[in-house]
Structure formats: C-alpha cells, structure tokens
Design a protein with these regions (language model features):
Chain B
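N-terminal membrane-anchoring/stem segments of glycan-assembly enzymes
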Residues: 1-44, 424-428, 442, 446-463
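Membrane-embedded multi-pass helical conduit in multi-pass membrane proteins
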Residues: 40-42, 311-461
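Cell-envelope/extracellular polymer assembly enzymes that use nucleotide-activated donors
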Residues: 46-49, 79, 238
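Acidic helix N-cap motif at the loop->helix transition within catalytic regions
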Residues: 62, 89-98, 118, 150
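Short, acidic, metal-binding catalytic loop of nucleotide-sugar glycosyltransferases
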Residues: 66-77
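A conserved acidic beta->alpha catalytic loop
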Residues: 75, 84-93, 112-115
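Long helical/loop segments within the catalytic core of UDP-sugar-dependent glycosyltransferases
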Residues: 103, 110, 117-136, 149-233, ...
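The conserved acidic donor/metal-binding loop of glycosyltransferases
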Residues: 142-146
C-alpha cells in the first residue's frame, strides 16, 4: 500500500467545519497569489533600475 | 586571456554566488502563489499530542502551555506532554500546576536522566505519546514558542493528504521590545524561512522542519522508528531528510505563524549558530549520496536545492577565495581587477536591492519593523562599496590606482568583513565594549557574522569537538503574540 492509499485520521465531515477550512484555504491562497504578483513587480522594478544604469553608462 | 588571470576572475566571481542564489531563492518564493500544497489540503483535525521538551524553562513554560491549550483547536483533540528533562528550577511546579488546572489535557513526564540534550528528551516524549493509540498526530515544539490562534489548524489541514508526513510553520522573531540583534534575526528569518522555505516547497524538497513547530502524522513517526536522530546536532534536519527520503512530503505552511524568543546578544547567538552550523556539516556528510542527483528524485537531490544548500555552507570559503583572488589580480593585472571588482559588487548591489524590496512583499510587518537592519544587513561598508562600484561603473569617477591602500582595502573586504564581525562578538563582553560591538556589527554586517560562525563551525567539526548540546537561554521576554 502506498502512502497515497493510507487512511487519513482526523478528517472532518461536519459541514460547518468543512466550510470554515475551505474559507481559510481560499483566503490563504489569495494571499499567496498576491505574493506572486508583488514579487513580479519588485523584479520588474529592479530590472528597470539596472536598465537605467546601463543606459546612463552608455550615454 | 591568460589562463591564470581567467582562473582568478572565476574565483573572484564566486564572491557573488551567494547573493545571486539568495535572490533566485527569493524570486522563486513568488511561484509559491501558483504552486503550493493548499489545493490538496482539507478539513482535518487529528487528535494531536504536543510534545514540549523543557530543561530549566520555568520562565516560559507556564505561558507556553496556557497558550497551547487556548489555541483554536477542539479541546478534546489536543493534549500537551511536557518532557521535563530533570530541570533543577521551578519548571516541574509550573507544569504540575497546569496538570491540576487542566485534568487529562496536560501530562508531565520527568526523564530518567537529564542534561543529555533536546533529542534525547524528545525521544522519551515521543515514546510516551506513541504508546497511546489516542495520538493521531504529534506536534514537536520548543518550550518558549507561542502559537497564533489558528496556527495548528493551518498545519493539520495538510495532513488530509496522506502523502504528507510532516508540516512546519513560519517561525518569527517576536520579542515585544527587540534590540538591534533581534531585528537582524527577524530580517534573517524573513529570507531564510518565509522566502527560502516557500521556494523549497515549490522545488519539492524541504531543508528543515523548524524545531519550534513540526507537526508529524503518526504514520510518519512510526515509519521513522518512533524516534528522532541523536547522533548529530541537527536532529530537525535529519528528521526532515528521513521523512522525505522515505517517500513522504514535508510541507511549509507560511500562514502557520509561530513566535519565538531569539538570543538577545552575540555570544548566545554564536553558541546557537555554531550548533546549527556543525549540524549542517554533519548532515552534508551523512547524505553524500543524495546531493545533485536530479535523475533519482526531485527535491532534495535537485540541482537548485543542492546549489542553495552548498552556497550557504560554503559561502565563507567563497568569500575568502574571492578576496584573495582579487588581491592577486590587483597585483598582476589591475585593469582586469577593477572590471571584476565592479562586476562582483554590482551583482551584490542588484541582488541587495531586490532582496530589500522583496522583503516588503513577503512580510510587510517584519520588513516595516526592521527595515534599518534590512538595509544594513550586508554591513554599512558593503553598502558604501556597492554605491562606489555603481558610481564608478556609470561615471568612471573616483577611480583609485591599483597600488593605493584604498584599493587593497576594497579588494580584501569580502574576507576582512568576517574578521570585523568576529571582533564585534569578542568585544561584546569587554568593559565598555557593547557600543563598539554594535557599531562593528553594523559596519561589517549581520551576514558577515553568520559567515564567520559557519567558518568556526567547520573548525570545530574538523577538530572533532564534543557534540555537546548547548542550550540557548530563554528569559521569558514578552512576545508579540502575547
């Protein structure tokens, strides 16, 4: 039996609790996606700074 | 180009490897937004035993137990087992008071023999926890940490995926009134935990389950023999590697925030980091057949994982080699030396800018609180050299000849900054030395301090010094979460 087939102890079936877990997961997923966007913006900002420096040096 | 000169150029550029790999790690952390384990998580509240090893922790243990029991987790599914490692202070009294106050929820276990270190105490606790079928999961923590209300729920949700063996959280430096050193540590954790562990999650291999917050499924601990390693100083890392090498996943959950009290002075920090550094050297040797084998498995054997592991481990050697090679180049080909000097420091500068800006995206709270230490993390002298290299590259101004003493100082700084950081630590206990110690650390940089500790850890390992566990003193200072 692989680990994927192992029965999971502690799984919750109460609908209210399941909904709460889902809401927490959605909230955390959104925050992680914001991190992705923020990192991309910062990377872009640094590339712009480098490009400006290179342009000034060549000018 | 002359082969000797070319070789020297390559060695000089090694001095820029750490910031490049560090930036890559932080950049990849953003991918965690698209690729994480959350979609496989589920509603899961296993019966959990919290194992807390405690040796003379009277200052903190009571508050820790109270906080654990007050967490947002069903009371009938949570027990706290304090493993009192033959404490000689009031630790037993503090725990026994909680045993009476919370019948059936707090267990006091006194070890048979004290002072053998955390791993031995943990093993006694794990044996007791696993002997009872009640335990479906075990949370291993340090005595001083404080969990935020929803932290345990956010960790257990990942155990809904049976492939997950262990979950760790985000340890944050949480002193309510932090000194400059605690702010440096907070900034370090932002990169080393919040960013690096997200990246490791993306790459499929976690380097270390934080000792202050590691949740294991019962199945995982049983597969590990119900014990953790006692032969190294890095039992957390060994547990992490063994979990993953046995085919189970180790997951980092950034929303599971845990506050910890970190060392308040350089001497205490030195002791703690020597232990970590030696542990990493021992782990590197132990898993020699695991590194850089991407064809066997992802994660721990991947190229990026190996690159980041060895860059941290070898960074002090790279810095010394880089400085020595640059000094030799300065003596034999100063025209080439200046070009490479600028290349190294401009690389440092670009990475530095990216790391500082990214910190505000990764953890705005810590970044806002500790931005001065973030800006001065590489040290004031290094920041000035970065500025100098940028001005030189763009305008060609402020040039100095190869034989000028300033040139030698600039070229040798990557190595000498470690000596200055070491001096900062030595001066700390000297009469009137505290101010000098602080000033030198800001000049040399906290990063240089971490490098010189790693170097000292090599030396201790090579000398075969005792694997003695040196406890980090906790004073029970108020934490942010409280």
């Amino acid at each position: 039996m692989s680990t994927a087939d192992t029965p999971v102890p502690g799984l919750v079936t109460d609908p209210a609790e399941v909904a709460r877990f889902a809401a927490e997961r959605d909230e955390d997923s959104r925050r992680e996606r914001r991190l992705f966007v923020g990192q991309a913006v910062m990377l872009l900002a640094v590339l712009v700074v480098v490009a400006v420096l290179v342009a000034v040096q060549r000018a | 180009m002359d082969p000797l000169v070319l070789s020297l150029v390559v060695v000089v550029m090694l001095g820029a490897l750490a910031p490049v790999v560090g930036s890559l790690q932080v950049a990849l952390a953003g991918i965690h937004g698209l690729r994480n384990h959350l979609r496989r998580s589920g509603a899961c509240l296993p019966r959990t035993v919290v194992v807390v090893p405690a040796w003379n922790e009277a200052a903190v243990i009571g508050a820790s137990v109270d906080r654990l029991l007050a967490m947002d987790y069903p009371a009938d599914r949570l027990r706290v087992l304090v493993v009192d490692d033959c404490s000689t202070d009031a630790t037993p009294d503090a725990v026994l008071e909680r045993v009476v106050r919370h019948p059936g929820r707090v267990i006091h276990l006194r070890t048979s023999e004290g002072g053998r270190g955390k791993a031995h105490a943990l093993n006694e606790g794990l044996a007791r926890a696993l002997a009872d079928e009640w335990a479906e999961a075990v949370l291993i923590i340090d005595a001083d940490v404080q969990f935020e209300d929803g932290t345990l729920r956010r960790m257990t949700r990942h155990l809904a995926d049976p492939r997950v063996g262990a979950v760790t959280g985000y340890i944050k430096e949480g002193s309510h009134d932090p000194g400059f050193l605690n702010r440096f540590i907070a900034w370090e954790y932002l990169d080393a935990q919040a960013a690096a562990r997200r990246t490791q999650d993306v790459l499929g291999g976690l380097a270390c389950l934080a000792g202050g917050a590691q949740l294991h499924s019962r199945a995982n601990l049983e597969a590990l023999g119900g014990r953790i390693d006692t032969s190294t100083l890095a039992e957390d890392t060994v547990t992490t590697f063994e979990t993953q090498l046995a085919g189970r996943r180790a997951v980092f959950e950034p929303a599971a925030v845990v506050w910890a009290e970190e060392p308040p002075d350089l001497h205490a920090l030195w002791k703690q980091r020597i232990r970590w550094g030696r542990g990493n050297v021992q782990v590197t040797r132990r898993y020699l057949s695991t590194w850089f084998r991407p064809w066997t498995r992802r994660g721990l054997s991947g190229v990026l994982f190996g690159l980041s592991w060895f860059t941290v481990l070898l960074q002090p050697l790279f810095m010394i080699a880089s400085a020595v090679a640059l000094l030799v180049l300065l003596a034999i080909r100063d025209d080439v030396a200046w070009v490479v000097f600028r290349a190294v420091w401009l690389t440092h500068g670009v990475c530095y800018l990216f790391l500082v800006l990214s910190a505000f995206v990764i953890d705005r709270q810590v970044a806002t609180r500790c931005w001065r230490e973030g800006v001065l993390f590489p040290g004031l002298v290094s920041v000035v050299i970065i500025g100098y290299a940028a001005v030189q590259a763009v305008t060609g101004a402020w040039g100095v000849s190869g034989g000028h003493p300033v040139a030698w100082l600039l070229a040798g700084w990557l190595a000498s900054c470690m000596a200055v950081a070491w001096l900062a630590m030595r001066l700390e206990t000297a009469r009137g030395g505290r101010w000098w110690s602080r000033a030198l650390l800001y000049l040399a940089g906290y990063g240089s301090f971490l490098c010189v500790v790693t170097l000292a850890a090599y030396v201790r390992e090579l000398r075969g010094s005792d694997n003695r566990w040196e406890k980090t003193e906790k004073r029970g200072r108020a934490l942010l979460a409280s």
